[in-house]
């Protein structure tokens, strides 16, 4: 995939922490342009998320996962912010203004499938785990994550 996508990967609403994920060719560049500390592969780095004027929006943890060793098989950046819905919207808008586009539902998993990181059963299992409403549904869905069926 040539474009870079961004979306919150935690449930919407107020929480202690929210995570925003970027994936694609420019994920590292876009995230680094708005983060005060230097990103390092597979290292959680503490720094500031900066707005367009360089003002601090939040103090955050940021992790870079260089492709192909990431969930999607592409460069991925995950930013752990305080869980304010406004802050999450601002972070996503900031990354979109710098060249990312808003990811569609399931698009990170779709990319993982297309890049050979998940087989079809595992990709469907991710969505089933997310949508599970009962313990039995959750157990059945979790069994698909490894790509096996019963």
Predicted regions and their residues:
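A glycine-rich (often HGG/GG-containing) alpha/beta subdomain
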Residues: 1-139, 143-147
């Amino acid at each position: 995939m040539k474009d870079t996508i961004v979306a919150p990967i935690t449930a919407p609403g107020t929480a202690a922490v929210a995570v925003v994920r970027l994936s694609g060719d420019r994920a590292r560049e876009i995230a680094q342009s708005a983060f005060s500390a230097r990103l390092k592969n597979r290292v959680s780095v503490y720094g500031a998320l900066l707005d367009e004027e360089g003002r601090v929006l939040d103090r955050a943890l940021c992790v870079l996962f260089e492709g192909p060793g990431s969930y999607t098989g592409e460069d991925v950046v995950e930013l752990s912010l305080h869980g304010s819905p406004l802050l999450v919207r601002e972070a996503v808008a900031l990354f979109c203004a710098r060249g990312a586009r808003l990811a569609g539902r399931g698009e990170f998993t779709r990319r993982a499938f297309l890049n050979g990181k998940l087989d079809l059963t595992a990709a469907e299992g991710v969505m089933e785990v997310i949508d599970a409403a009962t313990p039995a549904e959750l157990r059945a869905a979790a069994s698909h994550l490894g790509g096996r069926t019963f």
